[in-house]
């Protein structure tokens, strides 16, 4: 699938005070290590908290819907997974990965909204200004947008920094099959929110 807009963004769309309040709220929760179908520190090293807060969904949904339409993707989505609050401190990272895959959630999943569906749209919200940390770049790879389901990227040739995400309150929306990573943080702390919108498998 070749896209005209591999990602869509809204600069400083979330007010600073809301970003600050979210950081304050979720850093008070007990976090756990982020996983990739099981703990694997070679792929991922970050701390996460998951939330079903209705206010988060209400905040995120309009950006997802607008990006899905304005970017011309028009993906069939009908449910959003639990929102993830992520914290990256020094030496933490998330290596190359895709959020989506060809394998749908099982039909017996405890959440009815997940059953038989796959991740189609990923949304990332920057809660920290880039001046507060070093490293921690959010990068995408456009070398092969059709590489859905592969386990790793080899001979990466088309990496791009998503500079917009170094601005606090910026929202970036992209198809879940886009390869992306967060480079190691070398100083400071990077906070973000991530959500995934799901729908029936590709036809």
Give, region by region, the residue ranges found by the protein language model.
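Fe(II)/2-oxoglutarate oxygenase catalytic core
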Residues: 1-173, 177-203
